[in-house]
């Protein structure tokens, strides 16, 4: 707000006319930007027990705070001040030295990410693993111990056509993949006797019409 213009509302010159908002307000009532303005200090009615921020402007004159006056009144036995309540003192459990300015006297700091206090936070449990698909290759079985070497069962993953009854011991070794190669090579296609006869009759009929030049 400009310091040269006094604070007042514009009044209309005509009597009985309804005043509009644009006539009551003026641009002189709007203050210019104040820049980076932040709430960096707070001193409550408790004085020294109810303050935080940079109070170095006091220059060591902490007896001017209302909290110290309340303490002196309690020692004297007289309570003349209207505000007699005080807040709790520091929550960190240690007192600041007298030579330093009490910055953030009763503020609570949040744990730093990755710090020692963050390790005590509860961690979310990992989701359960999905069931293993049948197309995956079976994992190699662990080596049996010498004590249980006498009774060793070979386990395999059931195929898609087999009933889903879990893992079952394999009595024999798996057959090789090329065992049915011979049956695939000996595949014969039978078109049926009726189709073959019709094809042969058409071929013979066409050959009979063809005239061989002499």
Curated annotation (Swiss-Prot):
InterPro entries referenced in this protein's UniProt entry, alphabetically: Cdc42_effect-like, Cdc42_Effector_BORG/CEP, Cdc42_effector_prot_2, CRIB_dom
A GO cellular component entry from the record: endomembrane system
Its membrane topology: Peripheral membrane protein
Residues with N-acetylserine modification: 2
Disulfide bonds: none
Positions carrying Phosphoserine: 31, 101, 137, 141, 145
Entry's localization field: Endomembrane system; Cytoplasm, Cytoskeleton
Major subcellular location class: membrane
Domain of life: Eukaryota
A GO molecular-function descriptor: GTPase activator activity
All copies of domain CRIB, residue ranges: 30-44
Subunit structure: Interacts with CDC42 and RHOQ in a GTP-dependent manner, and with SEPT7.
Family (UniProt): Belongs to the BORG/CEP family.
PANTHER family: CDC42 EFFECTOR PROTEIN 2, CDC42 EFFECTOR PROTEIN BORG
Free-text comment on this protein's domains from its UniProt entry: The CRIB domain mediates interaction with CDC42.
Protein name: Cdc42 effector protein 2
Organism: Mus musculus
Gene expressing this chain: Cdc42ep2
């Amino acid at each position: 707000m400009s310091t040269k213009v006094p604070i007042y509302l514009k009044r209309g010159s005509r009597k009985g006319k309804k005043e509009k908002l644009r006539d009551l307000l003026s641009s002189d009532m709007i203050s210019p930007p104040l820049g980076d303005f932040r709430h960096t200090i707070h001193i409550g009615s408790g004085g020294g027990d109810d303050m935080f921020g940079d109070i170095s402007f006091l220059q060591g004159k902490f007896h001017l705070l209302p909290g110290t006056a309340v303490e002196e009144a309690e020692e004297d036995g007289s309570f003349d001040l209207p505000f007699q309540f005080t807040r709790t003192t520091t929550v960190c459990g240690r007192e600041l030295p007298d030579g330093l300015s009490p910055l953030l006297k009763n503020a609570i700091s949040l744990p730093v990410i990755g710090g020692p206090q963050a390790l005590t936070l509860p961690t979310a449990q990992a989701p359960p693993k999905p069931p293993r698909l049948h197309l995956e290759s079976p994992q190699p079985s662990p080596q049996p111990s010498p004590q249980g070497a006498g009774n060793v069962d070979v386990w395999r993953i059931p195929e898609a056509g087999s009933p889903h009854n879990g893992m079952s011991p394999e009595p024999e070794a798996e057959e090789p993949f090329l065992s049915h190669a011979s049956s695939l090579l000996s595949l014969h296609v039978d078109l049926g006797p009726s189709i073959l006869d019709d094809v042969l009759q058409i071929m013979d009929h066409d050959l009979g019409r063809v005239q061989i030049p002499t």
